Regions:
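N-terminal secretory signal peptides that target proteins for export/translocation
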Residues: 1-7
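A beta-strand edge to alpha-helix "cap/lid" segment located at domain peripheries
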Residues: 28-43, 49-58, 68-170
Length: 170
C-alpha cells in the first residue's frame, strides 16, 4: 500500500521547490538580460569611439566574422576582411563625428538581438576631397539616418554585429 501522507509530503515539497525555483530563475534571466544590455552598450560605445577616431581595427573588432553590410546605395559587403577593405578609403578621406538622436532600441531573440537607433553623422572631408570613394559609404556632410543592426552572441558571451544597414532620412 502507498503511504498517502508520504506522497502528500513529497508533493508539497516539490510544490514549494517549484514555487521558489521559478522566481529565482526569472531573477537570473533578468540579471543575465541586464548584463547582456551592458555588453551591447559597451560594444556600441567602443564602435562609436572607433568611428570618431578613424580606427579601422577598433571598428572591425565590433563585427562578427561573417558580417554583412547592406548600404542603401551600394553593393552588399560580406565578411570582416571585405568590410575592412571598404573602411580603408572611408577613413582616409574624412573624419566623422556622431550625434545620437535616439536611444538604441534593443530587442532580444535568443542569441540574436536587433538594435535600431537614429544617429546624425557629421563628415569632415580632408584636404580637397569632396566624396568618399567606397561605393555605398555616406557622402553628405551631414547624414541623419535610422540604423538597424542584427547582433549575434559570440561563443565567449560577447556580442558582435552580424548585419549593419541604415536608411538616410535627410
Amino acid at each position: 500500500m502507498i503511504n498517502f501522507s508520504f506522497s502528500k509530503k513529497i508533493s508539497f515539497l516539490i510544490l514549494i521547490f517549484i514555487t521558489f525555483l521559478i522566481p529565482l530563475n526569472l531573477k537570473g534571466m533578468h540579471h543575465e538580460r541586464e548584463l547582456d544590455k551592458m555588453k551591447i552598450f559597451e560594444l556600441y560605445e567602443d564602435w562609436d569611439i572607433a568611428v570618431e577616431a578613424s580606427d579601422i581595427d577598433g571598428y572591425v573588432n565590433s563585427l562578427d566574422e561573417n558580417v554583412i553590410l547592406i548600404p542603401p546605395d551600394g553593393p552588399t559587403i560580406t565578411g570582416r576582411d571585405s568590410y575592412r577593405n571598404f573602411l580603408g578609403p572611408v577613413f582616409e578621406v574624412a573624419t566623422y563625428k556622431l550625434e545620437q538622436k535616439t536611444p538604441r532600441d534593443i530587442k532580444f531573440y535568443g542569441d540574436f538581438v536587433t538594435v535600431e537607433y537614429n544617429i546624425v553623422v557629421y563628415i569632415n572631408f580632408l584636404g580637397n576631397e569632396k566624396s568618399v570613394p567606397s561605393e555605398g559609404a555616406l557622402q553628405d556632410s551631414v547624414s541623419d539616418s535610422i540604423y538597424f543592426d542584427l547582433l549575434k552572441r559570440q561563443e565567449d558571451g560577447s556580442w558582435k554585429c552580424l548585419i549593419h544597414t541604415w536608411r538616410q532620412i535627410n
